[in-house]
Amino acid sequence: MSSLTIRNASIADIELIRELNLQVWPQTYSHLQTPGQVNYMLDMMYSKDALEKQMADGHQFIILYDKHIPIGFASYGEIEEHIFKLHKLYILPAHHGGGKGRFVIDFIKNDILTKGAEALQLNVNRKNVAKNFYEKIGFKVIRSEDKDIGNGYFMNDYVMEKKLTNEHEEFKNSL
């Protein structure tokens, strides 16, 4: 685990984020959605313009490295006072396991606690096995959501949340 590092991303990293995503998304979603929907969502959420807009809208992107090799990325941001959302968390399939996802979540949690976070939310496709990982690290399903994303496609997700209130108190006491 000591070989893992995270750094904040910028607009200069958009091509790297897109490259990583193209290695993750087809494998992750090809059995959950039609090829047409996968391609539509890739263009909608991961085009250069879409990523620039997300960054301009306050999404904090980070890149995960293992021994200086980029192996994943995430983005997150505040969606309402004291509530933050994990917008994306993707790690190359060959690098799954070994606590890397937890390492990223802990990094994000520590960052947002400094900003007064009381909860971290995320959306996960209802058929995505990543739901099990999120439950294992303390997220709970708070509702189901079917979001029309255009072109006749829907995102059929669980909205999950991890309360950080106790962790926020522990964090404040450690300062």
Give residue spans per PLM region:
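C-terminal "cap" of GNAT-fold acetyltransferases
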Residues: 118-131, 135-140, 147-175
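Acetyl-CoA-dependent GNAT
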Residues: 8-14, 18-94, 105-107, 111, ...
